Amino acid sequence: MLLLGTSRGLSGILRAAAAGVLLDLCSHGILMVGAKLYERGASIGQVIAFLVASPWNSFSLTLILIALIGFWWTMGFIVLSMVIAIIAGLIFDRLVNRGVLPGNENNIELPENFHFWSNARTGIQHTKFSASFIFSTLKQGIKESRMVMRWILFGILLAGLVRAFLSPETFGTWFGPTLAGLGLTVLVATIMEVCSEGSTPIAADLLTRANAPGNGFAFLMTGVSTDYTEIMVLKETTHSWKIAFFLPLLTVPQVLVVAWLLNVFA
């Protein structure tokens, strides 16, 4: 929480969004981390910024996106998602201040003499980097990566099926850079309960085959904003249906505007 920041202003939101981008977890794995941050006293705005900025911005998916759509499109998507996350987080905190949404009653006070970097340095110094430690870390990493690889392969399979049954002309007509194509993209992203690793190849196809960069961005982002698992976890964590439903209410319109602008001007 010291790194995330205890302030309820822009600084805390920026730190939360940056933490979401840097943390290498899938869209469902990140939910548990967000819930724990809320339990540790993070504001609801920080939690929302963390969740919205994070799901497909993990380091592994960034490399995959660069391979699929190129470096500059990937960087553009990351920056735009952070902007949406920061705006949503600020609005959430403002609504809490006005009494529209309930605030976080959890609060954990850190000792006055607590310094993160000195404590982290002490912990690293006491860690024994032996051969068994390195082997155990690699083994655990390979074991845990199965979940990510499974969803990536599932996404590739879905993209392959789309390519097999939809010609480029049909795909471009249905999911092209039009308002109808954008609406259909958001509808499919809302219905599909696919992890971020699985949605990435499909989003890349929307950009490369349908020539609709906004639709690709919307597919990645609305899969987060309208994900019913995320909405339910927010409800269980905050004990508020209002907070849970304000997630799509405040993020989806931003995503649609950005996606439309990308389709028109990109």
Please place each PLM-identified region on the residue numbering.
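Alpha-helix capping and helix-coil boundary motifs
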Residues: 8-11, 125-130, 240
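Membrane-interfacial helix-loop connectors
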Residues: 20-78, 163-243, 265
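Membrane-interfacial helix-loop-helix
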Residues: 1-22, 168-174
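Selected transmembrane alpha-helices and immediately adjacent juxtamembrane segments
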Residues: 2, 75-186, 208, 245-266
